[in-house]
């Protein structure tokens, strides 16, 4: 069994003060909500706690308990409904494994000859545009088809300011590094 550092940004847990007791509970502690108290880190404005992870475990369900009374799920994480019908957050360990990430040196690579036998000197300014081809790509603009939709219907919508919340965090680069690793593997075939 190993430990996993769970980090939750301060602005994700709304309506709580630093005096409130915030406990993470889930499958890993049999929903006892006593051992895994979130600690606030003022320098990064995050709450942190180490949670256990069994070897080979790819995900775990969890919730946050506020002051031993209020059980909440957070829009920041994916949700799943368990066998009893309860909605819980789910944490995918595989997406966050540091062992899958590697340092990829980014340096210009010039080719010796093109198909016509001419050297390519302008490859130094080349770039690769990485985008998703899924139904809701992060690079696509989502247009609301019903402009009469009221704000109260949007309560369950996840809203994040990616420019503020994630720019200084190491975790924000992990996804980019995974994509870069896949691109590098593709090019080396």
Swiss-Prot record:
Effect of inactivating the gene: Disrupts glycophagy (autophagy of glycogen).
Gene: ATG45
A Gene Ontology term for the protein's cellular component: autophagosome
A Pfam cross-reference name: AMPK1_CBM
Name of the protein in question: Autophagy receptor ATG45
Annotated region described as Binds glycogen, given as residue ranges: 1-96
Assembly description: Interacts with ATG8.
Region (Required for sequestration into autophagosomes): 97-189
Taxonomic source organism: Saccharomyces cerevisiae (strain ATCC 204508 / S288c) (Baker's yeast)
């Amino acid at each position: 069994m190993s430990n996993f550092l769970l980090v939750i940004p301060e602005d994700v847990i709304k309506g709580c003060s630093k005096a409130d007791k915030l406990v993470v509970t889930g499958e890993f502690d049999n929903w006892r909500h006593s051992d895994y108290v979130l600690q606030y880190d003022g320098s990064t404005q995050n709450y942190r706690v180490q949670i256990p992870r069994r070897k080979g475990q790819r995900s775990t369900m969890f919730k946050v308990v506020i002051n031993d009374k209020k059980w909440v799920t957070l829009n920041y994480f994916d949700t799943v409904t368990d066998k009893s019908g309860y909605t819980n957050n789910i944490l995918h360990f595989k997406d966050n494994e540091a062992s899958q990430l590697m340092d990829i040196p980014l340096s210009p690579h010039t080719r010796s000859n093109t198909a016509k036998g001419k050297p390519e000197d302008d490859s130094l300014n080349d770039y690769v545009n990485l985008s998703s081809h899924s139904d809701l790509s992060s690079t696509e603009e989502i247009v609301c088809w019903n402009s009469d939709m009221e704000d109260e219907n949007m309560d369950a919508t996840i809203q994040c300011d990616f420019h503020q919340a994630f720019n200084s965090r190491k975790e924000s680069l992990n996804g980019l590094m995974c994509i870069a690793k896949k691109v590098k593997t593709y090019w080396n075939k």
